[in-house]
C-alpha cells in the first residue's frame, strides 16, 4: 500500500480510538443534549438577524432625515506662538476666501474642538455660514442686528485621534484647549483695552464637547462665556472600557455643580438618526447657576430644521449650521451670559413669551366669530411672526389680546416624505400658529394679517385620555384647529416606541400636523427639550423619545404622552389610537446595549470555566469545552436566566435605591424585565457560536501546521521550541521595552501563541482541552485590549505614541505569558486545593460582575479576569 493511504488509514484508526476513549471518560447521559449548543447557535444567529432587521426598519420608519448640502471656500492660517504649548497639536485661524480678507482680528473669538477622529477642517461649514451672514447683514445695513461684531473662528488640530476610546487622549487634548484659550485672547492685544475680548466661546462636536468641558477648571472657566456642543454624549461615555473615562465624566459633573464661574452649556442633539452615540446621553440634567442654566435641544424641535440628523452631518447640515452661525453672531453682541442664553433659546427653542402689541401694524383686518374662549389661528405659508389679535364686543374699544406664536413645518408638496431626504425643509415652508385666550365668547376677534395668505381660525381643545384611544363624540362639523392630547397612562421609556394611528374624516384641506412633545425625566426638566413633528398620512406614526427614562440613568420614569394636532376644520381628526411596539425594543437595544455583547458572553464563558474546574476537582480529568458548554445549556443556563430575571425584578421595584440603576440592563420598569432574559439567552448563543468557530479554526490551523511523520507525532517537548522562543521574545519585550510596548499588545501576541499551541497539541487529551479552554477564554477578552493596541499603533504611525498609566504595567502581562509557558511545557491542572478554591471564588466574582454591572461598568471585568488567569496559572505551574 502506498505511504499516503497507509498514513490516512492509521490516522483514522487513531482518531476513532481517541474518540471512543474520550467518550468512555466523559459519557453523555442524554445524547439529545449534544444538540442544545447547536440549537442555541441557530437561535443566536436568527435573533441577531432579527435585531439587524429591526434596527433597519426603525431607522427607515423614524430615522429618516433631510438636510441641504452646504458649500464654502475655506482657508486656514496656522498660529505660531513663542510660548511652547504642544508639538503634537496645532491651532488654526479660519478665513472664508473672498470675504475674510483682513489679517488682523477684531471680532468675537470662537474655538472649535473636533470630536473622535475629527478634523480641524470640520469648522468650515459653520464658520463659512457665519461669515456670509455677517457680510450680508453689513451690505443690507441691518444695524438693528449687527453691532460691529463678527466671529473669528479658531480650530484645534487634534490629529484626528481616537478620543472616544482613550481617556488619556481626552486629558491631553483638554490641556491643549486650555492653552489655546489663553493664546487666542493674546491675539487681540493690538486692540484698545475696552475692545479686547475677555472670553472665548467654545464650539465642539462629539467627544470634543467632553474635551471642552474637561478643560473648564476654576481658572480657565473664567475665560469662556458659553460652550456649544453638537452630538456630544454628556451623561454616559460611548464605550465603558476604561475606568479613567468614567473618572473624567465624574470630574466634569463635579465641576459643573461646584464651580460658580462654570460657563453654561448648550447641547444640540441629532436624535434617532445619530447611531454613533446614544442620544439619551446628549440630554442634560438641570444645573442652575444664578440665572444661567444648561439647555439641551434635539434638532427635530429646532425651528427651521425639524429633522433628526446623522452624527457627522450635524456639522455640515445647512439648516443647522445656518441657525448655529446666526445664533453665535447674535450672542457675540450681547453684554452678558444671561442675554446670550435668551438669544440661544430664541434661535433653538422658538423661545417666545406672550406678546402684546399695543397698535396694529396693518390696516387690513379679518373678522372671526368666537367659537371658544381658547382659540388657535393657523396662517399657512407665513414665515413671519407679525401677528396682532384684537377682541371687540361692540360696546367698548377693541383691545389687543396676548398671543403665543410659533412657526411649524408646512411643506409645499404634501405628497413628499417629511423630512425630504437631501433637502429638508425650506425657509418658506412654514405656517404660523397663534394661540390666544379670550375673556368671553360673545365677541369678535379681529386679526391684522394683510401680508398673510390663508388664515384658519378654530377652537383649542384639551383631551385627557385614560385609555389608548380617543374618538370624536359629536357628528357635527368640527370647528377645532388645535387638539391637545394627554395619554396619561402611556408607558414611557427610550427603549419603547408607540404606534400612533390617526383616522381622518372627509378631507378637503391639508393633512393634520402632529407634534409629539417628549416629557423629560424629572431631573432633566427645564434643561432638555425634545419634540418631533409628523404629518398624518394614513400609515402608523412611530413615536419615540430620548429624554424619558433610559438605561443606566438615575432618573425616575414618568407616565404620559403629550400630543398636539393642528388641523383644518375641513380635514378633521376623527380618532386617535396609541399602541406599544415592543418589537422595536430590539432596535433601540443596538446602540444602548453595545457593551452587553462584550460583557455577558465573558460571563457565560466564566460559567463554563467554573464548571470545568469543578468537574476536574471531582473526576481528576479536564472536560472538553464544548462538552461543558452542552452541560451548561442543559442545567446551569436556565438557572442563571432565572436568577437574572429575579435580580432585574428586584431592581424594578426599587427605582430610588442608590446606584441600583447601573445593574443588569439599567432599566427600572417592570415591563422591561423580560429583555434581561432575552439578551441572556442571546448572549449564551453568541458564546456557542464563538466557541464552535474557534474550535473549527483550531482544527483547521492544526491541519495546516502539523507535519505527519508516520502514525506517531513528535513529542510535545520537541515541538514546542517555537513556543518557547515566543515566550522568551515576549518576556524580553515585556521587561526590556516596558515603557514602550503596552501590555495589551503582549496579551494579543500571547493569544496567538496559545492558538498555535492548541493547534499543535495532540487532539482529545487533557493538555489539548486545557490549552483550547485557555485559547477560547482569552480570545473573548481581546475586545477589551484591541482598541488600545489600535490607538497605540496609530500613534506610533503618526509619531505621537502615548500610553495610559496602566499600559506599561507588567502585572497585566504576567498571566498570558505564563499561560503560553505552561502550554509550551505541557503543564496541566494540579490539585492544589488552595489555588483551586481561590480560583473558583475569583470565577464566581467574575460571573457576578459580568452579568450585574458588566453592561455599564464594562472596564471592571478586565482586572477581575486578569486575577482569574493568575490563579488559574497558579493551579497549573
Swiss-Prot record:
Sites carrying sugar chains: 291, 336, 374, 448, 473
Compartments (UniProt record): Endoplasmic reticulum membrane
Active site: 206
Enzyme Commission number, as recorded: 3.1.-.-
UniProt topology in membrane: Multi-pass membrane protein
GO molecular function terms noted in the UniProt entry: phosphatidylinositol deacylase activity
Biological process annotations from GO: GPI anchor biosynthetic process; protein transport
Entry-linked InterPro entries: AB_hydrolase_fold, PGAP1-ab_dom-like, PGAP1/BST1, PGAP1_TMD
SUPFAM superfamilies linked to this entry: alpha/beta-Hydrolases
Known function: Involved in inositol deacylation of GPI-anchored proteins which plays important roles in the quality control and ER-associated degradation of GPI-anchored proteins.
Name of the protein: GPI inositol-deacylase
Organism the protein comes from: Cryptococcus neoformans var. neoformans serotype D (strain JEC21 / ATCC MYA-565)
Amino acid at each position: 500500500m502506498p505511504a499516503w493511504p497507509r498514513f490516512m488509514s492509521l490516522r483514522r484508526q487513531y482518531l476513532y480510538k481517541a474518540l471512543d476513549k474520550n467518550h468512555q471518560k466523559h459519557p453523555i447521559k442524554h445524547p439529545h443534549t449534544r444538540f442544545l449548543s447547536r440549537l442555541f447557535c441557530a437561535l443566536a444567529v436568527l435573533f441577531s438577524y432579527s435585531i439587524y432587521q429591526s434596527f433597519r426598519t426603525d431607522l427607515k420608519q423614524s430615522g429618516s432625515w433631510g438636510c441641504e448640502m452646504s458649500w464654502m471656500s475655506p482657508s486656514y492660517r496656522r498660529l505660531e506662538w513663542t510660548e511652547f504649548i504642544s508639538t503634537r497639536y496645532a491651532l488654526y485661524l479660519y478665513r472664508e476666501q473672498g470675504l475674510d480678507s483682513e489679517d488682523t482680528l477684531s471680532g468675537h473669538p470662537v474655538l472649535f474642538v473636533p470630536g473622535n477622529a475629527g478634523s480641524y477642517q470640520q469648522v468650515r461649514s459653520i464658520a463659512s455660514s457665519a461669515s456670509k451672514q455677517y457680510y450680508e447683514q453689513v451690505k443690507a445695513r441691518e444695524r438693528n442686528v449687527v453691532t460691529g461684531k463678527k466671529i473669528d473662528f479658531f480650530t484645534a488640530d487634534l490629529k484626528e485621534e481616537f478620543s472616544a476610546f482613550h481617556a488619556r487622549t481626552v486629558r491631553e487634548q483638554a490641556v491643549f484647549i486650555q492653552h489655546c484659550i489663553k493664546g487666542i485672547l493674546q491675539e487681540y492685544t493690538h486692540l484698545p483695552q475696552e475692545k479686547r475680548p475677555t472670553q472665548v466661546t467654545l464650539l465642539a462636536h462629539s467627544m470634543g464637547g467632553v474635551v471642552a468641558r474637561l478643560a473648564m477648571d476654576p481658572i480657565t472657566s473664567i475665560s469662556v462665556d458659553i460652550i456649544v456642543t453638537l452630538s456630544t454624549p454628556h451623561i454616559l461615555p460611548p464605550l465603558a472600557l476604561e475606568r479613567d473615562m468614567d473618572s473624567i465624566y465624574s470630574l466634569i459633573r463635579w465641576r459643573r455643580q461646584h464651580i460658580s464661574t462654570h460657563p453654561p452649556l448648550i447641547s444640540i442633539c441629532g436624535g434617532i438618526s445619530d447611531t454613533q452615540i446614544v442620544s439619551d446621553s446628549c440630554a442634560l440634567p438641570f444645573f442652575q447657576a444664578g440665572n444661567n442654566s444648561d439647555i439641551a435641544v434635539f434638532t427635530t424641535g429646532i425651528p427651521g430644521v425639524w429633522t433628526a440628523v446623522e452624527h457627522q452631518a450635524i456639522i455640515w447640515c445647512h439648516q443647522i449650521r445656518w441657525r448655529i452661525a446666526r445664533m453665535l453672531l447674535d450672542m457675540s453682541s450681547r453684554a452678558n451670559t444671561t442675554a446670550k442664553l435668551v438669544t440661544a433659546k430664541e434661535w433653538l427653542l422658538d423661545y417666545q413669551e406672550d406678546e402684546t402689541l399695543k397698535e396694529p401694524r396693518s390696516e387690513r383686518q379679518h373678522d372671526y366669530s368666537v367659537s371658544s374662549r381658547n382659540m388657535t389661528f393657523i396662517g399657512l405659508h407665513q414665515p413671519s411672526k407679525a401677528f396682532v389679535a384684537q377682541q371687540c364686543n361692540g360696546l367698548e374699544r377693541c383691545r389687543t389680546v396676548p398671543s403665543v406664536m410659533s412657526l411649524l413645518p408646512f411643506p409645499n408638496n404634501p405628497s413628499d416624505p417629511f423630512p425630504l431626504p437631501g433637502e429638508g425643509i425650506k425657509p418658506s415652508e412654514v405656517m404660523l400658529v397663534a394661540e390666544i385666550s379670550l375673556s368671553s365668547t360673545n365677541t369678535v376677534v379681529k386679526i391684522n394679517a394683510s401680508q398673510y395668505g390663508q388664515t384658519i381660525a378654530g377652537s383649542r381643545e384639551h383631551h385627557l385620555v385614560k385609555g389608548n384611544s380617543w374618538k370624536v363624540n359629536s357628528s357635527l362639523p368640527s370647528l377645532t384647529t388645535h387638539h391637545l392630547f394627554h395619554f396619561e397612562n402611556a408607558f414611557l421609556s427610550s427603549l419603547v416606541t408607540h404606534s400612533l394611528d390617526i383616522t381622518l374624516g372627509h378631507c378637503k384641506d391639508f393633512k393634520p400636523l402632529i407634534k409629539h412633545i417628549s416629557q423629560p425625566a424629572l431631573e432633566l426638566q427645564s434643561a432638555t427639550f425634545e419634540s418631533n413633528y409628523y404629518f398624518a398620512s394614513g400609515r402608523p406614526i412611530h413615536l419615540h423619545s430620548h429624554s424619558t427614562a433610559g438605561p443606566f440613568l438615575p432618573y425616575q420614569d414618568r407616565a404620559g404622552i403629550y400630543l398636539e394636532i393642528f388641523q383644518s376644520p375641513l380635514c378633521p381628526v376623527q380618532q386617535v389610537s396609541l399602541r406599544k411596539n415592543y418589537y422595536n425594543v430590539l432596535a433601540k437595544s443596538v446602540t444602548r446595549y453595545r457593551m452587553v455583547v462584550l460583557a455577558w458572553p465573558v460571563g457565560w464563558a466564566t460559567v463554563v470555566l467554573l464548571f470545568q474546574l469543578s468537574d476536574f476537582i471531582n473526576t481528576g480529568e479536564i472536560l472538553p469545552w464544548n462538552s461543558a458548554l452542552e452541560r451548561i445549556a442543559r442545567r446551569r443556563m436556565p438557572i442563571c436566566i432565572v436568577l437574572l430575571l429575579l435580580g432585574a425584578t428586584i431592581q424594578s421595584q426599587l427605582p430610588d435605591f442608590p446606584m441600583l440603576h447601573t445593574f443588569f440592563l439599567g432599566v427600572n420598569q417592570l415591563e422591561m424585565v423580560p429583555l434581561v432574559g432575552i439578551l441572556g439567552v442571546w448572549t449564551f448563543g453568541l458564546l456557542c457560536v464563538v466557541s464552535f468557530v474557534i474550535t473549527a479554526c483550531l482544527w483547521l490551523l492544526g491541519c495546516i501546521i502539523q507535519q505527519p511523520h508516520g502514525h506517531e507525532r513528535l513529542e510535545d517537548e520537541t515541538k514546542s521550541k517555537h513556543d518557547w522562543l515566543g515566550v522568551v521574545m515576549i518576556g524580553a519585550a515585556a521587561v526590556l521595552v516596558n515603557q514602550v510596548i503596552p501590555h495589551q499588545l503582549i496579551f494579543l501576541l500571547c493569544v496567538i501563541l496559545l492558538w498555535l499551541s492548541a493547534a499543535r497539541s495532540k487532539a482529545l487529551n487533557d493538555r489539548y482541552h486545557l490549552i483550547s479552554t485557555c485559547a477560547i477564554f482569552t480570545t473573548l477578552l481581546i475586545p477589551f485590549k484591541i482598541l488600545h493596541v489600535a490607538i497605540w499603533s496609530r500613534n506610533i504611525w503618526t509619531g505621537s505614541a502615548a500610553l495610559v498609566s496602566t499600559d506599561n504595567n507588567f502585572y497585566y502581562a504576567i498571566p498570558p505569558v505564563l499561560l503560553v509557558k505552561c502550554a509550551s511545557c505541557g503543564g496541566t491542572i494540579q490539585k492544589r486545593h488552595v489555588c483551586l478554591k481561590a480560583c473558583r471564588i475569583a470565577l464566581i466574582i467574575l460571573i457576578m460582575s459580568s452579568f450585574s454591572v458588566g453592561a455599564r461598568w464594562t472596564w471592571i471585568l478586565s482586572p477581575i479576569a486578569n486575577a482569574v488567569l493568575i490563579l488559574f496559572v497558579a493551579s497549573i505551574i
